[in-house]
Regions:
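A gly/Pro-rich, aromatic-decorated transmembrane alpha-helix motif that marks the paired
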Residues: 27, 60-61, 92, 169-184, ...
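Central cavity-lining transmembrane alpha-helices of secondary-active solute carriers
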Residues: 46-68, 172-174, 349-366
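Cytoplasmic membrane-interface "Motif A"-like loop-to-helix N-cap segments
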Residues: 68-83, 368-387
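Hydrophobic core of transmembrane alpha-helices in multi-pass small-molecule transporters
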Residues: 16, 86, 100-125, 312, ...
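Short amphipathic helix-loop junctions that connect adjacent transmembrane helices
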Residues: 25-43, 183, 325-347
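Pair of pore-lining "gating" transmembrane helices in MFS-fold secondary transporters
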Residues: 2-36, 113, 302-328, 349, ...
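C-terminal ends and interior cores of transmembrane alpha-helices
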Residues: 81-102, 386-418
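Intracellular loop-helix junctions on the cytosolic face of multi-pass helical membrane proteins
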Residues: 1-6, 135-140, 147-157, 166, ...
Length: 520
C-alpha cells in the first residue's frame, strides 16, 4: 500500500461502493428473472448475457463521451446517478401475472439498461483517472532521476491490483444481501426458502398440473398439507403467494443497491478535486512537439493500438469462460451441488473472497521475482492466466465425467431421490472458483494496467472502454453456457470452455515477444 498516488484509495473506495450495489443485483439476476417471470434458464441467460454485454459495450460509449467532452469527472458523476435510478425501478415489488408481464418484463429490462448505461459512464472513466494518476506519478519521479522513475514504474501493476481488491471487497459481501433478505421475508410470511419451488410453481400456474416432486418441495417450503390435498384453486393461490413473497424479498435487496450508489457518489464528490483530468494533461504534454516528433508519435500510437486490439481479441474467450460464474456455474450450484442450507447465489462470494486473500500473495510473488531480475512481463502474465482458467474447466470436465452427469434437462427429469445421490459436495465449487480466481488475478487487473501503458494519452477513456468492450463481446455469448448446460452431458459442456481457454493461451504466447517490445 506504500508509495502509491494519494488518490488511489479514494478512487478505489468509490468503485467499491458501486461494485457492492452492482453485485447485490448480479448475484441473483438470472435466478430472479426465472423466479419472477417464469422464464426458462436459456431465456433468463439470454437477458443476462445482453445486460452483461451492455455494461461493457456502453463503457466504450462512456469513454468516447468523456474524451470528447473532456469531462471525465462529470461523466462519472452522472453514471452513478443513472445507476441509482435504475436500482430504484428494480426495487419496486410488483407481482408478475400473465396480464401484466407484457409491460412488466420490458420495464425490468429498461431498468437493467439504465444500470448498464450508468455503469458505462462510470467504470472505464474511473479506471482512466487511475491510469492518469500513475502517469503523473511517474512524470514526477522522472524529475528525481532514473532510479526513482524505475521504482515508480514498478508500482503500476500493483496499484491496479490494489484497486481490484477494493472492487472485490464489495463483491464479497454483496452476494449475501439478496438471499438473506429473501429468506427473512419468506420466514416473516410463514414460508421457507426452496430454490426449486419457483420453477415448479410457474409450471403449475401455466399448466395446472402437479407432480409428486412439486408436492414434496411445496411441503418443504411450508405449504399447508390441507392446501396440497385440495388441489386446483387452493394450490394456485399458494403458488401465487409463494412467488410474490419470494420475489418481494429480492426487490427489497435492490434498495441496498440504491444506498450503495449514494455512498459511492458521496465518496467521489468529496475527493473530486484530488483526481487528475486525463485529457487536460495530454493536451498540455503535446503542445511543444515538432511535426517530425508528432509523425513519429503517430507511428508509435498505431503500434500500440494494434497491440491493444490483439490482446482484446484474445481476452474475449477468457471472459466468456470466466463469467459463467453468473450463468452455468450458478445453475450447476443450484442443480448438482448439495446446498440444502446455502442459497446458490452465495457461492458467487467465493470468487471475491479468493481475490482478497490471494492478491497479496500473488503481488508478493511478482515482487520477489522482480527483485531477483526475473520479472514476468504483463503480456506473459495474461497468457499464463489463460492456462490457469483452462485448469478450472479441466477439473470440472474430469469430475463431471467421473460422476456420469447428464445434461441438466435429463438430470431434472430424474426422481428426487436419485438426484440426491448424484449431487456433489460444496468443495467442487470452491476448487473451481480457486483456479478461476487465480486466472482472473493474472488477467483482469494486469489487463487494466496493460491498457494504461499502451493507451495514447488523449484516448485513455476510449481505450479503457475498449478493454471493457472486449469483455462485452465475451458476455454477449454467455447464453451459450446455459444452452450447452441443458443440452449436453456436463463433461462436454465444460470441455468447450477448456478448449477456449487453451486456444486463447496459445495465441497469447505466440504474441508475447511482440507485445513486450511494444509496451517497452
Amino acid at each position: 500500500m506504500k508509495g502509491h498516488p494519494k488518490g488511489l484509495i479514494s478512487a478505489a473506495l468509490s468503485n467499491m461502493g458501486e461494485r457492492f450495489g452492482y453485485y447485490i443485483m448480479n448475484a441473483v439476476l438470472t435466478l430472479f428473472l426465472c423466479s419472477k417471470f417464469g422464464l426458462s434458464d436459456e431465456t433468463g441467460g439470454l437477458i443476462y448475457s445482453f445486460f452483461y454485454a451492455g455494461i461493457y459495450i456502453l463503457s466504450l460509449v462512456g469513454g468516447i463521451i468523456a474524451d470528447r467532452t473532456q469531462n471525465y469527472k462529470g461523466t462519472i458523476q452522472k453514471g452513478l446517478i443513472i445507476m441509482a435510478l435504475g436500482y430504484v425501478v428494480l426495487s419496486v415489488p410488483i407481482l408478475a401475472t400473465p396480464e401484466n408481464k407484457a409491460w412488466l418484463l420490458p420495464l425490468t429490462c429498461f431498468a437493467l439498461f439504465m444500470i448498464a448505461f450508468g455503469n458505462g459512464l462510470f467504470k472505464g472513466n474511473l479506471q482512466a483517472i487511475v491510469g492518469q494518476m500513475y502517469d503523473n506519478f511517474e512524470a514526477d519521479a522522472a524529475k528525481q532521476g532514473p532510479e526513482a522513475l524505475k521504482e515508480a514504474q514498478g508500482k503500476r501493476d500493483s496499484g491496479f491490483q490494489i484497486f481490484y481488491v477494493f472492487i472485490n471487497i464489495g463483491g464479497l459481501v454483496a452476494p449475501f444481501v439478496a438471499p438473506l433478505l429473501r429468506s427473512w421475508w419468506l420466514k416473516v410470511n410463514g414460508f421457507i426458502y426452496n430454490s426449486q419451488l419457483p420453477r415448479l410453481c410457474h409450471e403449475f400456474i401455466n399448466n395446472g398440473t402437479t407432480s409428486q416432486n412439486f408436492l414434496d418441495e411445496a411441503a418443504k417450503a411450508g405449504a399447508d398439507p390441507a392446501v396440497l390435498t385440495q388441489g386446483g384453486e387452493a394450490i394456485g393461490q399458494f403458488c401465487t403467494n409463494y412467488l410474490d413473497v419470494f420475489n418481494a424479498g429480492i426487490h427489497y435487496s435492490f434498495i441496498a443497491s440504491v444506498v450503495a450508489m449514494m455512498i459511492s457518489l458521496v465518496i467521489f464528490l468529496a475527493n473530486k478535486k484530488k483526481f487528475p483530468t486525463p485529457t487536460k494533461k495530454a493536451a498540455s504534454a503535446n503542445a511543444g512537439y515538432t511535426a517530425e516528433e508528432k509523425a513519429s508519435m503517430a507511428k508509435e500510437i498505431k503500434q500500440r493500438m494494434y497491440a491493444l486490439f490483439a490482446v482484446l481479441g484474445v481476452v474475449i474467450f477468457f471472459w466468456l469462460a470466466f463469467h459463467q460464474n453468473g450463468q452455468s456455474l450458478s445453475l450447476f450450484a443450484r442443480d448438482f451441488v448439495n446446498t440444502d442450507k446455502i442459497a446458490p447465489e452465495i457461492w458467487q462470494a467465493v470468487n471475491p473472497f479468493f481475490v482478497i486473500v490471494l492478491t497479496p500473495i500473488i503481488m508478493w510473488i511478482f515482487g520477489a521475482l522482480g527483485k531477483r531480475g526475473k520479472q514476468i512481463s504483463t503480456p506473459r502474465k495474461i497468457a499464463y492466466g489463460m492456462g490457469i482458467a483452462a485448469t478450472a474447466y479441466l477439473f470440472l470436465a474430469i469430475f463431471s465425467g467421473v460422476m456420469g452427469y447428464p445434461s441438466a434437462t435429463d438430470f431434472r427429469g430424474m426422481e428426487v431421490a436419485q438426484q440426491a445421490t448424484m449431487k456433489a459436495g460444496p468443495w467442487v465449487l470452491i476448487a473451481t472458483y480457486f483456479f478461476l480466481t487465480v486466472a482472473e488475478l493474472f488477467i483482469s487487473p494486469l489487463g487494466l494496467s496493460f491498457v494504461s501503458k499502451v493507451a495514447p494519452k488523449h484516448l485513455l477513456g476510449l481505450c479503457q472502454g475498449l478493454w471493457l468492450g472486449a469483455t462485452a463481446v465475451g458476455n454477449l455469448f454467455l447464453w451459450i453456457g446455459p444452452l450447452m448446460y441443458n443440452k449436453m452431458p456436463l463433461w462436454a459442456c465444460w470441455s468447450v470452455f477448456l478448449c477456449m481457454c487453451l486456444l486463447a493461451m496459445g495465441v497469447m504466447l505466440g504474441m508475447v515477444k511482440w507485445l513486450e517490445k511494444v509496451t517497452k
